[in-house]
Amino acid sequence: MSTTDTIVAQATPPGRGGVGILRVSGRAAATVAQAVLGKLPKPRYADYLPFKDVDGSTLDQGIALYFPGPNSFTGEDVLELQGHGGPVILDLLLKRILALPGLRIARPGEFSERAFLNDKLDLAQAEAIADLIDASSEQAARSAVNSLQGAFSVRIHQLVEALTHLRIYVEAAIDFPDEEIDFLSDGKIEGQLNGVMADLEQVRTEARQGSLLREGMKVVIAGRPNAGKSSLLNALAGREAAIVTDIAGTTRDVLREHIHIDGMPLHIIDTAGLREASDEVERIGIERAWHEIEQADRVLFMVDGTTTDATEPAAIWPEFMARLPATLPITVVRNKADITGETLGLTEVNGHSLIRLSARTGEGIDLLRNHLKQSMGFTSNTEGGFLARRRHLQALETAAQHLAQGHEQLVSAYAGELLAEELRLAQQSLSEITGEFSSDDLLGRIFSSFCIGK
């Protein structure tokens, strides 16, 4: 669709509400104002006016705001009509506007997309709008605001600027090889490169924290029937989310709970007990359990402490460990410490974490929560932090790889041309985060996930 069309959409959630807002952006915004309001409101002043139908009858009355471009959210002429939040009224007003020539319904995220295309926002800031709307905790919301205000973008621009300066220095060394000073081997370029790499690593650390705030951690509780998996889910959730009985195989399907640990979203999944299925329903539940296990960030291997003294996962259940993906982190949870009398606590056993607790009494649950937070490297101190998406982490990782390869070319062979190319590729990867270098396909995928009115 053309970006020169004038677009309109409801900017408030669908359904009944005290206020409903329609947003118009584009060249015909002033025409819409004249047709619906009978006048063009004074720019950036709230005007209380009737909203007129084509025959002059009043559809609604409310506040009109007019923002001439380029001093608007999208950089275009923008008109906002704030009326009553009834769906019928808003639909009538929307139809009235769409009947005017040159108007069409906005695509999801098109207002933010136009703001990006008109240099009102960079891509990271535009994404922060959607992240702010979707924030599930206070920390996530504050970090999204920081990103919207440019905290993440500033860090990326600083890295890009440092790489630009370094590239100029390297290119000069390549173009003037006859100079008395060998810029490639005198240590100055390596020192600057090491500085950029250190700064990038710091940004990656902060971005991982931002990603955890946004994406959270997926934890799957797995084990044999009657090990206490559902009791652990209830203890972590702080409510009776799952049915708990003494009958083995009570849980037949996947149960999901979403909680927060100091602002980090935790997606807890309780699964059917793993064993030879006794019927088709249980077989399907066990298949779903393994599907969730394979996609987890961490598995809580639930063990009934009254049935074994073993603490090594392979000794407890070798078949289970053999099927687990080799890189999947697990924590062995020895349950029923209130019965066995085991000392509550967390230890390390041959590279695996082992925690002793009682899901029934809740003893040791806080220790498990802290363990999950620390295992992901999450810190609750997000002052000045920013949110990050998976694509941001991938771009930062790619940039780090190019810088590492460039460093290798420099110290092993003083290969200026190869170093310059790696610096260029690293800079390109970083520029994808803010949208200075992005494909149309990437932009389409990002903005299509936004709300219609954004």
Swiss-Prot record:
Binds 1 potassium ion per subunit. (6S)-5-formyl-5,6,7,8-tetrahydrofolate binds at R23, E80, K120, K454. One of its GO terms (molecular function) is GTPase activity. Residues 216-377 form the TrmE-type G domain. Signal peptide: none annotated. GTP binds at residues 226-231, 245-251, 270-273, 335-338, 358-360. It comes from the Bacteria. It is found in: Cytoplasm. K(+) binds at N226, T245, I247, T250. GO terms for cellular component: cytosol. Its main location: cytoplasm. Its EC number is 3.6.-.-. Its cofactor is K(+). Keywords: Cytoplasm, GTP-binding, Hydrolase, Magnesium, Metal-binding, Nucleotide-binding, Potassium, tRNA processing. The keyword DNA damage does not apply. Mg(2+) binds at S230, T251. GO terms for biological process: tRNA methylation; tRNA wobble uridine modification. Homodimer. Heterotetramer of two MnmE and two MnmG subunits. Exhibits a very high intrinsic GTPase hydrolysis rate. Involved in the addition of a carboxymethylaminomethyl (cmnm) group at the wobble position (U34) of certain tRNAs, forming tRNA-cmnm(5)s(2)U34. Belongs to the TRAFAC class TrmE-Era-EngA-EngB-Septin-like GTPase superfamily. TrmE GTPase family. This is tRNA modification GTPase MnmE. It comes from Yersinia enterocolitica serotype O:8 / biotype 1B (strain NCTC 13174 / 8081). The lineage of its organism: Bacteria, Pseudomonadati, Pseudomonadota, Gammaproteobacteria, Enterobacterales. The gene is mnmE.
